């Protein structure tokens, strides 16, 4: 590919010694990758001590990059233009002790991948060198807004296809420079009036689709998975041949903006920043912690890129003659200085960026959620074809690993149960609610809204949960709320859904789009699963009560009579659901006890014997299991009120196993009852010769098979029939059994823990000490123009490129999951001792009471006939 930026290109350097993980079908784009297997070239990045000739060592990079020609005899000695080599005499120069030189020194901050401290050191202007750079004067916008353009590395510039690079709009720098803005204001004040702007608006482009990715602390694999999935979906839209919309009024890619909002510097994974730097959206050493003493609230980077990194650390670049090349994507990267929660991230998205870009549709994604092929286009089409559609969501399914619907993660019963939950929700719940026009929850991990539909009261109510507005809102803010309302905002997406449908004078409705799919990671361990469901259960319960209490606001909306009729039906359905959920604890216990009593103590009016251990042993075993059930139910309250899940991991795992075993026993008993109903005389004594009325009476009698058939059809048949009608039945064979076994735990463990920790709303912000390492921006009066300017380091292109080499190495290095420390804290040990003491005290006294008050001589409450 011809280049107008000499010196540095992304050249292919294949190597046979390079290890490449097994390709995954969703990420494998071999035609674009910079890696080919049949070549003898040696990587120019590898350390001399880790080359194949060194015993016991092996290069594990999935991609090799070069910024010089493909001559394997050359080593990556960084060269500079003469005017930058040693501008201040022989005592100054590059301190090159990185791989590729004869004697590598200790790793310096530019190369280290596993050190947050290394990232801190890289934030200093001119890091990695002791040279003195020239400076340039940057004028502040309206005297207060710091916005600077920085040249991107030559390799990134050269990766842009010529047809885009040569079609610049009036000197546009979107492919050659990254724009950095230090936002020192609240999101509500990020306006054109205050001097803030964004590139798509500066280029007078209409934004049809704003794709937002919210991030907290996900690793680079999860982030790359989401971002690459978005890039592939943008390609699907750009490649549309017969579109009535996208191919008119300018290129399709100019109507799409991708916005990444990172919730704080402190929790952010610094390796993820290297991935963003590799595609040009971020650079080390440019952020300012304050401007003239006014603290920076958010660091905003803008760049239009054609590069992407896959989940297995493979860099994808475009090819000129390939229709499957990724098109340009307009990127906005907002890195908040402090951790201020997801609602605040959405305030930056909607109130700051949304008001400037004014998009038609906003799609929300969580980092780690990968949209499927053409999924984003399917969501957008739903809005395009329905002018009254205010919000929509697609199908979210659990990530099961290699093997697709038969992935190896299904071996974990917790993952399998969650997979079944997701599938049944997408088959039964979401379509039903969509037919009514009100989907109670559009998951924040994968949903879309029409921007003008949520403007006004829906967003105002939604942002009451932002703790950064607590002082401004007073009693209406998060600090003035009672504990019920605070829990309500743990399920903030439900609040937005209700406010959107109930918006006064409007007739917006919500929908489920089956054609749009996305996959997401689910918790694989008991402690993580319990912690996640605490927030979900408490938030959804509070939000459900809120929507029922404020249903009268629907009468102020613009919905027609038919829609209002179905909304009333849905209200009744929601009331029943809340009641069933409220009494589910007793329901499971009663079901377990009644089934055990029916089978273990059969009526004397028939000849049936106790099943499965006979008339003597079965009642004893049933009583033991019932006492164990109640004992572990009580234990859940003790654990939930005094311990955190990670500190009581073993106790929770044992609880999951015990409730699963009891549920398995109950399922066996229920199957026995079904067989007995159809095989015994009393069970099949149906009147068939005295008319339809007598037939129905005998069929649905207490001893008839009708009740059993209805129970089976409602429990098992509905799931099977609906799954086959949706042409997606595989979860019934891979996950249904695990779900049945874990169903009691979902109630007895998760709900007890959630309600017992109703007080935990977790609104506090974490520290942000990482911002302390950032330099400040101090303005000076320009002698000529008398305006406020900031002196900024002006790095030569050669130095930018040399530092980019190390960035690519860090970004494409194989991901090493951090080792989770299982050591319990001192506080955990104290709480565990307290739990064991209280449990031993309660259960020993209960055992004594049962033994003494038992009517029979069997001191454990057994009643043997």
UniProtKB/Swiss-Prot annotation:
Q: Name one GO cellular component term.
A: plasma membrane
Briefly explain the null phenotype: Results in significantly reduced chitin synthase activities but does not obviously affect cell morphology, growth rates, chitin contents, or virulence. If it does not affect virulence when solely disrupted, the virulence is drastically reduced in a mouse model of acute infection in a doucble CHS2-CHS3 disruptant. Leads to increased expression of the other chitin synthase genes for compensation.
Q: How does activity depend on pH?
A: Optimum pH is 6.0 to 10.0.
Where does this protein reside within or beyond the cell? Answer: Cell membrane
Skewed-composition ranges (Basic and acidic residues)? 23-34
On induction, the UniProt comment says: Highly expressed under stress conditions, such as the shift of cells to temperatures commensurate with infection, or to conditions that induce cellular morphogenesis in this fungus. The promoter contains a negative regulatory element between -1600 and -780 bp.
Indicate the transmembrane segments per the record.
565-585, 620-640, 650-670, 707-727, 735-755, 837-857
Record InterPro entries: Chitin_synth, Chitin_synth_fun, Chitin_synth_N, Nucleotide-diphossugar_trans
Instruction: Name the segments for region: Disordered.
Output: 1-59
Pfam families xrefs: Chitin_synth_1, Chitin_synth_1N
Give the record's membrane topology.
Answer: Multi-pass membrane protein
Catalysed reaction equations from the record: [(1->4)-N-acetyl-beta-D-glucosaminyl](n) + UDP-N-acetyl-alpha-D-glucosamine = [(1->4)-N-acetyl-beta-D-glucosaminyl](n+1) + UDP + H(+)
Q: What is its EC number?
A: 2.4.1.16
Q: How does temperature shape the activity of this protein?
A: Optimum temperature is 25 degrees Celsius to 50 degrees Celsius.
User: Polar residues compositional bias: what residue ranges?
Assistant: 36-45
Reading the lineage from the top rank, the first entry is Eukaryota
A GO biological-process term: cell wall organization
Alphabetic keyword roster: Cell membrane, Cell wall biogenesis/degradation, Glycoprotein, Glycosyltransferase, Membrane, Transferase, Transmembrane, Transmembrane helix
Q: Give the matching PANTHER family.
A: CHITIN SYNTHASE (PTHR22914), CHITIN SYNTHASE B (PTHR22914:SF11)
Reported function: Polymerizes chitin, a structural polymer of the cell wall and septum, by transferring the sugar moiety of UDP-GlcNAc to the non-reducing end of the growing chitin polymer. Is not only stable at different pH, but is also able to tolerate a broad temperature range. With CHS2, plays an important role in virulence.
The UniProt similarity line reads:
Belongs to the chitin synthase family. Class III subfamily.
Protein name per the record: Chitin synthase 3
List the source organism. Answer: Exophiala dermatitidis (strain ATCC 34100 / CBS 525.76 / NIH/UT8656) (Black yeast)
Organism taxonomic ancestry: Eukaryota, Fungi, Dikarya, Ascomycota, Pezizomycotina
What gene is this protein translated from?
A: CHS3
């Amino acid at each position: 590919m011809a280049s107008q930026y000499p010196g540095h290109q992304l050249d292919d350097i294949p190597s046979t010694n390079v290890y490449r993980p097994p390709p995954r079908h969703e990420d494998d784009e071999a035609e674009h990758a910079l890696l080919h297997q049949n070549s003898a070239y040696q990587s120019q990045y590898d350390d001399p001590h880790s080359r194949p000739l060194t015993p016991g060592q092996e290069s594990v990079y999935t991609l090799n990059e070069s910024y010089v020609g493909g001559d394997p005899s050359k080593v990556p000695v960084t060269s500079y233009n003469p005017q930058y080599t040693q501008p201040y005499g022989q005592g100054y120069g590059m301190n090159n002790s990185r791989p590729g030189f004869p004697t590598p020194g200790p790793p310096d901050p530019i190369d280290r991948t596993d050190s947050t401290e290394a990232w801190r050191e890289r934030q200093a202007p001119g890091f990695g060198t002791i040279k003195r750079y020239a400076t340039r004067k940057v004028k502040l916008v309206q005297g207060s807004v710091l916005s600077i353009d920085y040249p991107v590395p030559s390799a990134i510039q050269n990766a842009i296809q010529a047809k885009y690079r040569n079609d610049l709009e009036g000197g546009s720098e979107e492919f050659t420079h990254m724009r950095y803005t230090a936002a020192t204001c609240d999101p509500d004040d990020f306006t054109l009036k205050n001097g803030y702007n964004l590139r798509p608006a500066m280029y007078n482009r209409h934004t049809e689709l704003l794709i937002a990715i919210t991030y907290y602390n996900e690793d680079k694999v999860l982030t790359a998975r989401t971002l690459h999935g978005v890039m592939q979906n943008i390609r699907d839209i750009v490649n549309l041949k017969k579109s009535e919309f996208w191919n008119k009024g300018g290129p399709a890619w100019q109507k799409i903006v991708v916005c990444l909002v990172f919730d704080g510097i402190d929790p952010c994974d610094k390796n993820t920043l290297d991935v963003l730097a590799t595609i040009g959206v971020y650079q080390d050493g440019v952020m300012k912690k304050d401007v003239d003493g006014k603290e920076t609230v958010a660091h905003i980077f803008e760049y239009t890129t054609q590069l992407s990194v896959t989940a297995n650390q493979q860099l994808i670049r475009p090819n000129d003659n390939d229709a499957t090349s990724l098109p340009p994507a307009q990127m906005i990267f907002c890195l908040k200085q402090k951790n201020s929660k997801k609602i605040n991230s959405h305030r930056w998205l909607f109130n700051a960026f949304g008001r400037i870009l004014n998009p038609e549709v906003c799609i929300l994604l969580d980092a780690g959620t990968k949209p499927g092929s053409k999924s984003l286009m399917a969501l957008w089409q739903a809005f395009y074809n329905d002018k009254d559609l205010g919000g929509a969501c697609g199908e979210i399914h659990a990530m099961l690993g290699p093997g697709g619907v038969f992935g190896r993660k299904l071996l974990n019963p917790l993952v399998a149960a969650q997979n079944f939950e997701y599938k049944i929700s997408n088959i039964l719940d979401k379509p039903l609610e969509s037919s009514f026009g009100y989907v109670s929850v559009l998951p924040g991990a994968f949903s879309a809204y029409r921007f003008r539909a949520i403007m006004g009261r829906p967003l105002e109510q939604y942002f009451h949960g932002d703790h950064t507005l607590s002082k401004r809102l007073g009693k209406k803010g998060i600090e003035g709320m009672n504990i019920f309302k605070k829990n309500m905002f743990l399920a903030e997406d439900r609040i937005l859904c209700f406010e959107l449908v109930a918006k006064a004078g409007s007739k917006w409705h919500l929908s489920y789009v089956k054609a749009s799919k996305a996959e997401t990671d689910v918790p694989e361990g008991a402690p993580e699963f319990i912690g996640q469901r605490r927030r979900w259960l408490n938030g959804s319960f509070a939000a459900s009560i809120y929507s029922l209490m404020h249903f009268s606001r629907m009468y102020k909306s613009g919905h027609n009579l038919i829609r209002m009729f179905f909304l009333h039906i849905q209200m009744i359905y929601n009331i029943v659901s809340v009641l069933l959920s409220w009494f589910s604890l007793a329901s499971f216990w009663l079901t377990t006890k009644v089934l055990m009593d029916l089978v273990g103590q059969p009526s004397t009016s028939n000849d049936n014997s106790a099943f499965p251990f006979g008339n003597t042993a079965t009642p004893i075993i049933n009583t033991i299991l019932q006492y164990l059930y109640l004992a572990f139910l009580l234990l859940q309250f003790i654990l939930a009120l005094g311990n955190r899940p990670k500190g009581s991991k073993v106790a929770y795992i044992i609880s999951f196993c015990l409730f699963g075993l009891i549920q398995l026993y109950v399922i066996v008993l229920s199957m026995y009852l079904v067989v007995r109903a159809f095989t015994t005389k009393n069970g099949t004594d149906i009147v068939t010769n005295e008319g339809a009325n007598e037939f129905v009476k005998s069929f649905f009698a207490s001893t008839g098979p009708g009740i059993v058939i209805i129970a089976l059809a409602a429990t098992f048949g509905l799931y099977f029939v609906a799954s086959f009608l949706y042409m997606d039945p595989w979860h019934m064979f891979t996950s249904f059994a695990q779900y049945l076994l874990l169903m009691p735990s979902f109630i007895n463990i998760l709900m007890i823990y959630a309600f017992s920790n109703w007080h935990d709303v977790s609104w506090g912000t974490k520290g942000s000490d990482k911002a302390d390492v950032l330099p400040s921006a101090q303005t000076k009066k320009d002698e000529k123009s008398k305006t406020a300017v900031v002196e900024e380091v002006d790095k030569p292109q050669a130095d930018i490129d040399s530092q980019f080499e190390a960035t690519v190495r860090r970004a494409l290095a194989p991901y090493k999951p951090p080792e989770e420390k299982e050591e319990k804290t001192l506080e955990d040990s104290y709480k565990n001792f307290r739990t064991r003491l209280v449990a031993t005290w309660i259960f020993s006294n209960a055992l004594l009471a049962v033994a003494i008050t038992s009517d029979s001589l069997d001191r454990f409450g057994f009643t043997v006939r």
